[in-house]
Amino acid sequence: RDPEMSRGLGDVYKRQDMLIGMSYGLISGYFGGKVDMLMQRFLEVANGIPRLVIVTLLLLVLQPGMITIIFALMLTEWVGMSRIARAEMLKLKDQEFVLASRTLGAGSFFIIFKEVLPNIIGPIITQVMFSIPTAIFTEAFLSFVGLGIPVPQCSLGSLISELYNSFTTHPYQIIPPIVVMSLLMLSFNLLADGLREALDPKMKSM
């Protein structure tokens, strides 16, 4: 069940990354002007704080566990998604189909989530797939140093940490969880590459 715990963390992280980062970037790019400037300044401040420091402090203050790790990642790992979403919005906000929706009286949020979002779903999905290995590695690192998921729950990081204590006597036991975690992260990266080639017309033409 150790890979299931790590993969489950990646799935939950994927949903919150799309919800927070994507919405933030789309709104910032669509409204522009002072709204975009203020939102981007906040984004720069949030991105300037080391993410691992925030996650570690939250785990020291709150009770360690899956919910705390998800909450910590939710506060720190949405910046990349928001930048991708904003860049795509800036490309499409002045396109004819958006201008036509405005002319017909469509509201801002209808245009953002019903008109623009379906047209940028490719880059969004690709970014999500690339972000999941980061979440898995962060959880594994925190569990390895004793700040992750507590007993009786178990993840790949906590399993590696436990086997590391007996590395001098049974070094071969630590190899399987390391290989599993590496393959899990590699599979998401390969999936992201495949989705990018399948969903990006520019990649198809190369």
List the predicted regions and their residue ranges.
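Single conserved hydrophobic/aromatic residue that forms the stacking wall/gate
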Residues: 1-13
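A short glycine-centered flexible hinge/capping loop motif at secondary-structure junctions
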Residues: 17, 21, 25, 29-33, ...
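Amphipathic cytosolic juxtamembrane alpha-helices at the membrane-cytosol interface
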Residues: 32-40, 90-94, 98-126
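C-terminal transmembrane helix and the adjacent membrane-cytosol boundary/short C-terminal tail
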Residues: 59-62, 66, 72-76, 122-132, ...
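Transmembrane alpha-helices
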Residues: 14-20, 109-141, 188
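Glycine-rich helix-loop "coupling/hinge" segments at transmembrane-helix boundaries
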Residues: 59-61, 88-89, 137-180, 206
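Generic hydrophobic transmembrane alpha-helix motif, especially the helices
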Residues: 19-92, 125
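Short amphipathic alpha-helical coupling elements at transmembrane boundaries
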Residues: 37-44, 58, 87, 99, ...
